[in-house]
Amino acid sequence: MKNFKKLLTSLFIFSIFSGILFSQANQYTPDPNAQYGYGVPLSSIPQNAQDFIRQHFPNIEVSYIERDWDDIEVYLANGTQIEFFPNGDWKEVKTYTNMPDSILPQNVMATVKRTYPQAAIIKIEKQFTIFEVKLNNMMELYIDNNGTLIGQKFDD
């Protein structure tokens, strides 16, 4: 009898977690009106993604855009790669040229400059309320929205 109760409890917990997972999966269903694939035009991605590119990379031509159901990747002529969520919010920027200071909030940028003033930013990744900032000196900084340095590590 005890084993039967354990089995029922396990099945109940499993069904709850399965329901949660399937309900979250529905949040990421493809937009039927969006254009997907390789080489999609700039005009087909969300307006806030277009505005981000124009604001932070105004004189750099868009070379290529790839759009899947779960992200949008934009490649610029200078080698910069920008990754967006399907709603057009940016999630990652990689560059080997000058990263625009305007991408990060001022207090986050101030922490980067104060911590490693000679280093250049080559990658920024937004993870909820934390920014992962990779520098050209092989350091990765973890900074919250308030500009507090949470951690750092050598990226080997």
Sequence positions of predicted segments:
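Sec-dependent signal peptide cleavage junction
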Residues: 22-51, 55, 155-156
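Conserved histidines in hydrophobic membrane contexts and catalytic metal-binding motifs
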Residues: 72-75, 131-135, 139
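Acidic (E/D-rich), amphipathic helical modules within compact regulatory domains
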Residues: 48, 53-96
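C-terminal low-complexity, charged extensions that often adopt amphipathic alpha-helices
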Residues: 7-9, 13, 113-122
